[in-house]
Regions:
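Glycine-rich phosphate/adenosyl-contacting loop at the front of the ribokinase-like
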Residues: 2-92, 116
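Hydrophobic beta-strand scaffold residues
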Residues: 67, 93, 178-180, 210
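A short, aliphatic-rich alpha-helical micro-motif
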Residues: 9, 141-143, 200-203
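A short helix->loop->beta-strand "cap" motif at the edges of active sites that frequently abuts
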Residues: 170-177, 246-249
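Catalytic-core regions built around general acid/base machinery
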Residues: 159, 163-174, 197-205
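Conserved phosphate/ATP/ADP-binding segment of small-molecule kinases
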Residues: 188-249
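Conserved N-terminal subdomain of the carbohydrate kinase-like
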Residues: 66-150
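Active-site metal-binding loops of divalent metal-dependent hydrolases
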Residues: 20, 153, 182
Length: 249
């Protein structure tokens, strides 16, 4: 078995690229208990930073790792909230830039009907995180990281998809390990073929892929439908062996 080795001399443990949003959950504290009721009857919410890569950034810093975030936020109070939230937790925000054409952060409202029943109401029109541009991606920043995590939602639309692919290309160039978090969200995509095209581009270059069986099926749709977990893993091993062989002098 071949293990993935990270360059321990690099100052940043993980750089994350992609979706950041604002989550509103029914308030539940000593003063207010709003859970287990329809969303239309909830009057008070608690606000958090959300989005898979944002949550991972917070999680790894809690475990003592150094993380940075590449992303786009709205030029308003919510955008400032995200940057402050990250700064307070020790996440580097030097690569977070503000939108200039009025795009807004995504807003997500959680409905909790019971301990086992929940759903979300999401607003993602003219969304800030998908405005990330190739000019926002810098080789030196990626070169300083042991690994970069690419969120699949960043591939849903231009100009973000080109920015994400540029980050992947630069990571390969400077030998920063690539983690692909498929992070499938149906509302971001127009059709299944488009999903497979862009997911597979990044998956082929990734050292680690995070996803469910459904997400792997979406990625593999135009390559080979109906693959099992074992077949997907074997394909990944073959790709890694080819990569290791090509890097051998």
């Amino acid at each position: 078995m071949k293990y993935i080795e990270f360059d321990e001399s690099r100052p940043m443990d993980l750089v994350l690229l992609g979706r950041v949003a604002i989550d509103f959950n029914p308030a539940y504290n000593d003063q207010v208990k709003e859970e287990f009721k329809p969303l239309k009857k909830v009057h008070m919410f608690e606000k958090f930073v959300g989005g898979s890569p944002a949550n991972i950034a917070v999680g790894v810093t809690k475990h003592g790792l150094k993380a940075g975030f590449i992303g786009k936020v709205s030029d308003d109070q919510f955008g400032e909230y995200v940057v402050d939230y990250f700064d307070e937790r020790g996440i580097d925000t030097s690569q977070i830039t503000k939108c200039t054409n009025g795009e807004k952060l995504g807003l997500t409202f959680t409905e909790m009907l019971s301990p086992k029943e929940s759903s979300i109401l999401m607003y993602r029109n003219r969304i800030a995180d998908l405005q990330l541009h190739v000019d926002d991606i810098h080789e030196d920043y990626i070169k300083n990281a042991k690994a970069i995590l690419i969120s699949g939602t960043a591939l849903a639309e231009s100009p973000s998809r080109e920015a994400a692919i540029k980050a992947v290309m630069l990571a390969k160039k400077v030998n920063t390990k690539i983690i692909f978090d498929i992070d499938y969200r149906e509302y971001n995509w127009k059709n299944a073929d488009e999903i497979s095209i862009y997911y597979s581009i990044v998956a082929k270059e990734a050292d680690i892929i995070m996803g469910s069986r459904e997400e792997f099926d979406l990625t593999e749709k135009l390559i080979k439908e109906g693959m099992t977990d074992e077949e997907s893993a074997a394909t990944g091993r073959q790709k890694m062996q080819r990569s290791l062989s090509s890097n051998t002098v």
